[in-house]
Amino acid sequence: MIRLECDYAEGAHERVLRRLFETNLEQTPGYGEDLYCARAREYIQQLCQREGIDVHFLVGGTQTNTTVIAAALRPHQGVIAATSGHINVHETGAIEATGHKVLAVPSADGKLTGREVRRVYESHWQDATREHMVQPGMVYLSQPTENGTLYSLAELTDLWETCQDCGLFLFVDGARLGYGLMSEACDMTLPDLARRCVGFSIGGTKQGLLFGEALVLSHPALRRDFRYHIKQHGGLLAKGRLLGVQFCAILEDGLYFELARHADRLAMELRRAFETRGYEMLFDSYTNQQYPILPDGLLAQLEEEFALTVWSKVDGGHTAVRVCTSWATEPQAVQALIRALDRWEET
């Protein structure tokens, strides 16, 4: 079985495993106060080309999103997100469990716009009964989106300026940030992102680490006492150096971005293969996640050899699936899927 349903089916890049083994018996301070976490923070600060930022390391994406959103919002506030946003559909109500409502906004492509955010904000403040409603206090988006689509630099800038006008925090979930930044369609850099939000994450779990997300915070209100919030939400890892070692290994010479570029390149090869054979795509994705619409008969045949994620039923005879490459996907796996498409065409 060739697994192309997600980007976390493999363990970790061999360099990461080697560094963990080499440092295994070293004795270091706990809770991220070690030299490896310090070095990884320096790498990230240099990549962001921005002073006045704090970098924290957490184990997973849901933990990261929940901790930062709960820290940013007052008890009566909620976070604006696209209906398809990860915190709204794939985190088991984690945000709501902290007492904060997700204010979901419909979006065909998974992206929010400054206009939509302003509409939600003004709708609340123009309502005479607003004190009986959840107040918007934050905007959540991911780059890339849950649908593999990308925000342009202009779109992100518009959202950032809107949030500043409205007094809203803007947070960017970067669980797949490398795949977004290395996409052929991406026109922004990491420093661009770092200057247009109050915080963002740099995903490792889906991009070559065993586990781990780096959280970058720039707003003073979020930076203050943030380690208290991490501990309260169960995220302050006693053996925190395991996160620092991994991020050092993958960031020190651009390996993180090289692996992301590899996944994107293979995903685009698959997209071209689907499109040249007449299959439409559900979303216009230029990242490692592709969403072809397939005849149900073809899907049944593919599922004998490949693990794919069924995304949505399109009509009585067609289904959209997610085909996902990763940092570790072999070119042979992509070629095997393309050959399977050709066999179907020949029947």
Task: Annotate the PLM regions.
Residues 14-61, 83-88, 94:
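Conserved N-terminal alpha-helix of the aminotransferase class I/II PLP-enzyme fold
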Residues 71-89, 118:
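Conserved PLP-anchoring active-site segment centered on the Schiff-base-forming lysine
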Residues 74-76, 268-345:
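Conserved C-terminal alpha-helix-loop-beta "cap" of PLP-dependent enzymes
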Residues 79, 102-103, 170-172, 281, ...:
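Hydrophobic beta-strand scaffold residues
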Residues 99-137, 141-146, 151-158:
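PLP-dependent aminotransferase-class I/II
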Residues 108, 135-136, 142-145, 150, ...:
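Active-site C-terminal subdomain of aminotransferase-like
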Residues 151-183:
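Catalytic PLP-binding core of fold-type I/II PLP enzymes
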